[in-house]
């Protein structure tokens, strides 16, 4: 084989490797806006609430409307198909270049090399958003990273990543769990009056979430921005149940991981893919993303936060809405996330 043939073969190999790597994630690159030069990393892998729909839809808005580069990682099968709840989440090296981490996870247990990079981000105080089940992001981790599990028992890290970074975990016995009948009762959220002027709540009006409410008792240094009410049905405008007092539904805080730099965090017990059909819920999440990056000046009450491209969320349950989709299927701004609803 000649040197030319060797060079050509080598070049082809690296091109194929690059293409294979790029195929396991989706990237949306904004052109103009305050987010120019900044990178948001979204990681979606939960079993029920369609984080694989929420994350790319918010990523498109942040890229198109604000100019960020947004990379979305997904739980996947070995064959590269999107598998909600999978602990195989390729692309974590993107976290090294991330300015913001946006999480929608539930009970995952990635390998140690993945967790090592995740921890490095936390040590530098990188801003973090966690939606819904991300309070119990990790379960089943073994060895040196087991303390991140939602039921982590270390005295200095009780409640694992969820409690110590986001401010809450999953512990129904201590008041952090389902509140009302999920799939039967929807949720209304209301801004805490004292926080009407908080940047995260700027321009936020009515908030209706289809996913059922959670109860929560955020860490003491949390600022509660919104509380919930359990509704008597799934309908917008349904009456709240009188025997269900309001619970914290969205809050901000700062965290410091293992003596590292201080970082900002936002958590909401809502955020399912149908929840963000509510403009109020969506605006709060987008505002929070900017707040976490200390970009309060870019939060405008009347900013355009409309969806970019077709968005047809599926109703949450444990049966995956998709079984044959790859990240590349939602490249660009015009592809449906994830598939359009069938005509009725």
PLM regions and their residue ranges:
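Helical hinge/lid and interdomain linker segments adjacent to catalytic or ligand-binding clefts
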Residues: 26-29, 41-43, 47-138
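Active-site rim elements
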Residues: 45-48, 184-189, 197, 201, ...
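Positively charged n-region of N-terminal signal peptides that target proteins for export
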Residues: 1-5
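Bacterial N-terminal signal peptides
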Residues: 8-19
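Stable alpha-helical elements in mature extracytoplasmic
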Residues: 36, 54-58, 94, 114-118, ...
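An acidic, glycine-rich "communication" segment
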Residues: 36-37, 131-238, 301-344
């Amino acid at each position: 084989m000649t040197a030319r043939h060797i060079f050509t073969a080598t070049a082809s190999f690296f091109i194929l490797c690059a293409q294979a790597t790029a195929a396991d994630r989706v990237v949306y690159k904004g052109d103009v806006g305050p987010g120019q030069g900044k990178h948001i990393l979204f990681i979606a892998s939960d079993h029920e609430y369609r984080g694989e729909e929420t994350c790319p839809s918010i990523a498109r808005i942040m890229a198109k409307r604000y100019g960020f580069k947004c990379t979305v990682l997904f739980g996947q099968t070995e064959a590269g198909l999107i598998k909600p709840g999978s602990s195989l989440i390729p692309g974590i090296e993107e976290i090294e270049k991330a300015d913001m981490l946006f999480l929608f996870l539930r009970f995952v247990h990635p390998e140690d090399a993945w967790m090592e990079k995740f921890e490095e981000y936390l040590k530098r105080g990188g801003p973090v958003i966690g939606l819904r089940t991300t309070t119990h992001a990790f379960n089943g981790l073994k060895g040196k990273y087991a303390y991140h599990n939602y039921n982590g028992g270390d005295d200095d890290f009780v409640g694992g990543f969820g409690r110590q970074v986001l401010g809450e975990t999953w512990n129904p016995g201590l008041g952090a769990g389902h509140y009302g009948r999920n799939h039967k009762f929807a949720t209304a959220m209301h801004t805490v009056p004292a926080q009407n002027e908080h940047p995260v709540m700027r321009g936020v009006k009515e908030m209706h979430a289809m996913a059922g409410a959670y109860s929560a008792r955020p860490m003491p240094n949390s600022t509660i921005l919104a509380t919930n009410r359990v509704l008597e049905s799934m309908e917008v405008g349904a009456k709240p149940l009188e025997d269900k007092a309001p619970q914290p539904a969205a809050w901000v805080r700062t965290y410091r991981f293992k003596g590292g730099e201080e970082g900002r965090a936002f958590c909401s017990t809502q955020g399912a893919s149908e929840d963000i059909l509510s403009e109020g819920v969506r605006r709060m999440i987008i505002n929070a993303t900017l707040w976490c990056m200390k970009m309060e000046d870019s939060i405008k009450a009347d900013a355009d936060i409309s969806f970019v491209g077709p968005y047809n969320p599926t109703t949450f349950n444990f049966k995956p809405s998709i079984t044959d989709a790859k990240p590349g299927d939602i490249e660009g701004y015009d592809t449906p996330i994830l598939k359009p609803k069938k005509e009725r």
